[in-house]
Amino acid sequence: MKIVLPVISGIFAILAGALAAQAQMKLPDLKKQPSAQAVLDEHFAALNKCDWNRLLAQYPEDAQINLPNGTIVKGRAAIGDLFAGFCKEPKDGGLNGIQFAVEHSTTIENTFATQWVATAPFLAEPYRGSDAYITHDGFMQAMVTTFDGSALKMKK
């Protein structure tokens, strides 16, 4: 319990900061992609540039992201908050500069089961994970991720 409380407090602090930042950011117009593969490619390209507008242009209002430990982020505004925190500079608690590379991906209709590796100048070692990306009608409808920022090993 001693470890869980600071972690939960840290998550709430990051989300509160992201909410404040999001209040100043307008959600971008949706941008439909021509194929499921184009949705996935755009996601990784936007994520690697920490391009908040491009990321959010993929997610319709009823989208959701399932995070580890049972957390579900629902709706564009909440997803915007999540990525606003993620795209902060490392000195501000974000991960801007992290690069995700697909190592393996299996496609089943409009869903991708994707193994990736993340690297960054501020990481002590590569971090691997796996996500399911569910696309629908040219958008990112849902994502199930194993990404756990607290498991990243940062350089000292």
Would you name each region that the model predicts?
Residues 63-74, 88-93:
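A short gly/proline-enriched turn/hairpin at secondary-structure junctions
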Residues 43, 55-56, 63, 75, ...:
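Hydrophobic pocket/interface hotspot
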Residues 59, 118-120, 146-147:
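Short beta-strand segments enriched in hydrophobic/aromatic residues
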Residues 81-126:
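Surface-exposed, charged secondary-structure patches
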Residues 8-18:
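Bacterial N-terminal signal peptides
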Residues 20-57, 61, 154:
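Short, low-complexity N-terminal intrinsically disordered segments enriched in polar/charged residues
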Residues 1-9:
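Bacterial N-terminal signal peptides that target proteins for export
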Residues 126-156:
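Short beta-strand edge/turn micro-motifs at domain boundaries
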